[in-house]
Amino acid sequence: MKLLLFITIAYLLGSIPTGLWIGQYFYHINLREHGSGNTGTTNTFRILGVKAGTATLAIDMFKGTLSILLPIIFGMTSISSIAIGFFAVLGHTFPIFANFKGGKAVATSAGVLLGFAPLYLFFLASIFVLVLYLFSMISLASVVSAIVGVLSVLTFPAIHFLLPNYDYFLTFIVILLAFIIIIRHKDNISRIKHHTENLIPWGLNLSKQVPKK
């Protein structure tokens, strides 16, 4: 019964459409009608600015972190916290409060890893920043980080210093999270192949793609 309760709470937390609500209530802007149409962190930064984007990133990460801490807070250590966190990501991606049309799972997945293995998140975040600097594409950085995440958990225990609290669900959950992230970025991947993906004004842009005006 408690397991079902934790899953429900995690899903509902994840379902809070942070960027969408911030846009509607503070800026009177519907993110779905601007930019990529996505309600996640990247489009929030692009359309609403740094303050709204930062708030969206922080809250979306917090949803994942809080969800993974639920079993610990209530003393149910027999329940896999990483598995509970997965349902927050599921809620973020398919939110009941926003017609099941949500973000691309990156920020909330990061929040889940922050609560489970902060050093491991730092490792993947370093990969994210490196790829972002080299190619100036948030989408590419997200996809590459997801792939590296899968490869790294498959090499455990070689990276035990990054995952001291390894959970037997971790490999399975990370693969699921990576799958969701990659699938949610399928349109971005297509644009990357055709050199039409959105760029940020930072980094080397090694693909030499011409930024959109």
UniProtKB/Swiss-Prot annotation:
A GO biological-process term: phospholipid biosynthetic process
Its job: Catalyzes the transfer of an acyl group from acyl-phosphate (acyl-PO(4)) to glycerol-3-phosphate (G3P) to form lysophosphatidic acid (LPA). This enzyme utilizes acyl-phosphate as fatty acyl donor, but not acyl-CoA or acyl-ACP.
GO cellular component: a single term: plasma membrane
Coiled coil (residue ranges): none
Protein name: Glycerol-3-phosphate acyltransferase
Superkingdom of this protein's organism: Bacteria
Record-listed E.C. numbers: 2.3.1.275
InterPro entries: G3P_acylTferase_PlsY
Family of this protein: Belongs to the PlsY family.
Subcellular location: Cell membrane
Keywords per UniProt: Cell membrane, Lipid biosynthesis, Lipid metabolism, Membrane, Phospholipid biosynthesis, Phospholipid metabolism, Transferase, Transmembrane, Transmembrane helix
A GO MF term: acyl-phosphate glycerol-3-phosphate acyltransferase activity
Subunit organization: Probably interacts with PlsX.
Matches recorded under SMART domains: G3P_acyltransf (SM01207)
Any Pfam family hit: G3P_acyltransf
HAMAP family: PlsY
Annotated metabolic or biological route of this protein: Lipid metabolism; phospholipid metabolism
TM segment ranges: 3-23, 68-88, 112-132, 134-154, 163-183
Catalytic activity: an acyl phosphate + sn-glycerol 3-phosphate = a 1-acyl-sn-glycero-3-phosphate + phosphate
Species whose genome carries this gene: Streptococcus pyogenes serotype M1
Record membrane topology: Multi-pass membrane protein
Gene: plsY
